[in-house]
Regions:
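Bacterial N-terminal signal peptides
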Residues: 5-16
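Boundary at the C-terminal end of the N-terminal hydrophobic targeting segment
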Residues: 18-20
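Acidic/His- and Gly-rich active-site-bordering loop/insert found
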Residues: 22-132, 151-160, 339
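Acidic/histidine-rich, surface-exposed loop or edge segments in extracytoplasmic proteins
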Residues: 35-46, 125, 228-231, 364, ...
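An extended, acidic, His-containing surface patch that forms the Zn2+-binding/catalytic region
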Residues: 94-96, 203-205, 261-329, 333-334, ...
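Acidic/histidine-rich catalytic neighborhood of metal-dependent amide-processing enzymes
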Residues: 128-129, 135-214
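A short core secondary-structure module
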Residues: 180-181, 232, 237-261
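Short amphipathic alpha-helices in soluble, non-transmembrane regions
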Residues: 242, 352-360
């Protein structure tokens, strides 16, 4: 008997039958399986430099095959041998179109010297799991894998197929993006009515209290430009007024003091309306004004002092990199800055570029686009999915606001949205607002939070894959 089959058999024995009216109570066997899968994922290096997502995908594929999934429903695919994707189909009755469950296997780089513990060993310490990817985003991936194995052990028959896609290339540093490749080359494997992406949204902890649960329904558009000032230069002992570094510095100063216009979308209005429930009275009043359309310039000015609120309300452009000069005793012949914009959905990149040129107001500083902006359409809020999320959060943690959000960063959901598949981003992991360590040193999650996320994912997937009478 394989190790994977032993765990699944233990799990099956510990869980009540599928015909019970209530979902099975959380069991130690279920959580132990989840811990084992998380450990397995963390301890496979999947960075872009020396890592390998294929190894992680193949190990998980063996677990699914040992659990009774048909070989045709467990596929490790991709254009390269080193960094492939895992796609698993949990077959249902076909009464409804499938739901896609999305996570990525790759992680950002981590240097052992920077960490207290080895980033590629799952370390348990003081109630936390430490390891690269615990927050971003192997923790979320492990909850999906564990839950599908649990449902299989219980012989759960969903009313739609549940498709799991664990992909490569989300963090960059790999020759391709897994979701983009699957849509182009293997669309039938992942085509779905909608997708749940566990790389966005989720719960917020404030001083140990579960305050609210975010559901991502939109994300901003990534677009970078360069600003370059040039000059004939000369000897530094003979300074001139037309200095390339000064010209660029002045342009960046003017850009830094500029705010793009406020344009709250329906998702953003819904976000402020829901988030008001957990804000201080003064902030809550401003949030409600945004939600009901009565906000004035003073309201927006107050909210914009908070970076998160500011980023929800408008397009932002910020200098992120600088280079210039060629010798310490020479006048600079060139100074260049990279400016990263996060545009509101629907914003025209050309219009943003024209605005930057107008704001910097210096013909000696030239703008050039660095990349081609990929549109990110806003998806309609599904009342059935929001109701399921609300019911599942209540079952695990009690009532709290379910808050539609716009992701200020970027996720793989952008490829699916552009392909016509609505994407909603959330996971069951609650992370303290002052302990966000994704991409940082000593990345960690609370073990209790991870166990709760396992229970939440199980409860939610039963709700979205069965009529209400069977879901609970």
């Amino acid at each position: 008997m394989t190790h994977a089959r032993a765990i699944v058999c233990l799990l099956a024995a510990a869980l009540p039958g599928v015909h019970a009216q209530q979902p099975s109570q959380p069991t130690r066997a279920f959580h132990d399986l989840g811990h084992a899968i998380l450990r397995e994922l963390i301890e496979v290096n999947t960075t872009g430099s020396v890592g390998n997502t294929t190894t992680a995908a193949q190990q998980l594929a063996s677990r699914f095959e040992d659990a009774g999934f048909a070989a045709a429903d467990v596929q490790v695919v991709g254009p390269t041998g080193k960094n492939r994707n895992l796609v698993v189909r949990y077959r249902g009755t076909g009464a409804h179109k499938p739901v896609l469950l999305l996570a990525h296997l790759d992680v950002v780089e981590a240097k052992r010297a920077d960490w207290t513990y080895d980033p590629f060993v799952l370390t348990e310490k003081d109630g936390y799991f430490y390891g690269r990817g615990t927050q971003d985003q192997k923790g979320g991936a492990a909850t999906l894998v564990t839950t599908l194995l649990r449902l299989k052990a219980e012989k759960w028959v969903p009313d739609r197929d549940l498709i799991l896609a664990l992909t490569a290339g989300e963090e960059g540093g790999m020759p391709y993006n897994g979701v983009e490749w699957l849509l182009k080359e293997k669309r039938a494997l992942i085509d779905a009515e909608y997708a749940i992406n566990v790389d966005a949204g989720g719960g917020e902890l404030d001083k140990g209290k579960h305050t609210m649960f975010d559901v991502q329904a939109a994300e901003k558009v990534f677009h970078s430009v360069s600003l370059t000032a040039t000059n004939s230069g000369g000897h530094s002992s003979l300074p001139r007024r037309d200095n390339a570094i000064y010209a660029l510095a002045g342009a960046l100063d003017r850009l830094g003091r500029f705010d793009f216009p406020v344009k709250p979308s329906e998702v953003v209005k819904a976000y402020f309306g829901k988030a008001a429930a957990v804000a201080t009275p003064a902030v809550a009043a401003d949030m409600r004004r945004v939600a009901n359309g009565s906000a004035d310039a003073a309201t927006y000015a107050r909210l914009s002092k908070v970076p998160m609120y500011n980023a929800q309300l408008r397009t932002t452009c910020v200098a992120t990199m600088l280079e210039g000069g060629h010798a310490p005793n020479a006048l600079p012949q060139m100074a260049r800055a990279k400016v990263n914009c996060r545009m509101l959905p629907g914003e025209d990149p050309a219009n943003v570029e024209r605005t930057i040129v107008r704001v910097i107001n210096d013909t000696s500083v030239h703008l050039a686009p660095i990349d081609t902006a990929v549109p990110s359409p806003v998806v309609p809020l599904r009342t059935d999915l929001l109701a399921a999320v609300d019911a599942s959060t209540r079952a695990i943690w009690g009532p709290m606001p379910i808050v539609p959000t716009m992701e200020t960063g970027a996720t793989d959901g952008i490829y699916l949205r552009n392909a016509g598949v609505p994407v909603y981003g959330f996971s069951g992991l609650f992370i303290a607002t002052d302990d966000v360590r994704a991409h940082g040193r000593d990345e960690r999650i609370l073990i209790k939070s991870y166990d709760d996320a396992l229970d939440f994912t199980y409860d939610l997937l039963k709700r979205v894959s069965a009529p209400p009478a069977r879901a609970r």
